[in-house]
């Protein structure tokens, strides 16, 4: 993150042989740059207005510093949040390991409880790590995206049947016609988005609440909508639901609330495909969340995004 600053400082030192500005002025600029490090990313270069050439350069550098500071802060916050999320399952595993060591040999009930809890926490950690790796690859632009032409209604049907198998006591209502709705996208990633939205609707809905899955076509786009009859989202929370590690209900148990990364992943996928999200929610009534993708003729040839 800080490498550009080091390069700028070196460049400023070399500029004295290439410009009519004095060596003293350029060395002063280089000195200001050298003072900026990870602990002082909020520092900015301040030069007198009379030094027009240097001032234009300083303004460009300050703008770059703003971007670096924002990216660095986000990175540090992400690492801090990830560490916090991993700390809890590790503590639970350690606690049950101690329980096993003390009582496991003589108490079958304690043995089974500990094994179940350790497996559950290990699975949660695995899911969290996989999601973190996905977002890291997305941030580094190394996450593969392999688009193919397919019918979005067929994919929605697959997701709906899977949800019905997993949550056999819930009511899922499909809403789409017989006409195909073709798109060109990474089928696995779009399926992942649908699963994330469906799982959230189930998670935040009462047992007797219905979940709707709609697929519709509009001019140039395909729309997928998941609607529930759940708790809804407070107006102040809607702008943050795609933030990493954000949970709409902070009081919920961590296992019920999930990792707080699902919607961040969903947004990355949809953004990468040139689409966007639309969210409508009312507390005590439910949430309707849609994502739109560019539509494509069924005969569209595969090509990389």
Regions inferred by a protein language model and the residue ranges of each:
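Short helix N-cap motif at coil->helix boundaries in the Bergerat
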Residues: 152, 232-243
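Short acidic helix/loop segment immediately C-terminal to the autophosphorylated histidine
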Residues: 69, 101-108, 116
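Short alpha-helical segment of the dimerization/phosphotransfer core of two-component systems
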Residues: 120-125
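C-terminal end segment of the histidine kinase catalytic
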Residues: 270-305
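Short helix-loop "hinge" at the ATP-lid/N-box region of the Bergerat-fold HATPase_c
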Residues: 201-202
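Conserved micro-motifs of the catalytic ATP-binding
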Residues: 140-145, 178-185
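A conserved beta-strand-to-alpha-helix junction within the catalytic ATP-binding
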Residues: 146-161
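Membrane-proximal HAMP signal-relay module
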Residues: 1-79, 97-101, 137, 244, ...
């Amino acid at each position: 993150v800080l490498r550009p600053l080091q390069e700028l400082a070196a460049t400023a030192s070399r500029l004295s042989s290439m410009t009519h500005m004095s060596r003293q002025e350029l060395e002063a600029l280089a000195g200001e740059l050298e003072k900026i490090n990870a602990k002082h990313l909020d520092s900015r270069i301040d030069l007198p207005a009379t030094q027009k050439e240097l001032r234009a350069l300083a303004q460009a550098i300050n703008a770059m510093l703003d971007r670096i500071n924002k990216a660095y802060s986000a990175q540090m916050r992400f690492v801090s949040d990830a560490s916090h999320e991993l700390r809890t399952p590790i503590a639970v595993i350690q606690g049950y390991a101690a329980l096993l060591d003390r009582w496991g040999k003589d108490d079958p009930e304690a043995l089974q409880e500990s094994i179940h809890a350790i497996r559950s926490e290990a699975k949660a950690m695995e899911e969290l790590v996989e999601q973190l790796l996905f977002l890291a690859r997305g941030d580094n632009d190394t996450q593969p995206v392999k688009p193919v032409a397919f019918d979005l209604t067929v994919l929605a049907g697959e997701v709906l049947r899977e949800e019905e198998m997993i949550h056999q006591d819930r009511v899922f209502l499909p809403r789409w016609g017989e006409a195909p709705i073709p798109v060109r996208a990474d089928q696995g990633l779009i399926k992942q988005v649908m699963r994330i939205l469906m799982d959230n609707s189930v998670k935040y809905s009462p047992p007797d609440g219905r979940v709707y899955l709609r697929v519709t076509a509009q001019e140039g786009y395909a729309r997928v909508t998941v609607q529930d009859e759940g708790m809804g989202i407070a107006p102040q929370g809607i702008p943050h639901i795609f933030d990493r590690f954000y949970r709409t209900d902070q009081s919920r148990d961590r296992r019920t609330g999930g990792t707080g990364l699902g919607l961040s992943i969903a947004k990355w996928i949809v953004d990468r495909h040139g689409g966007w999200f639309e969210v409508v929610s009312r507390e005590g009534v439910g949430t309707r969340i849609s994502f739109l993708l560019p539509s494509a003729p069924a005969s569209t040839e595969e090509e990389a995004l």
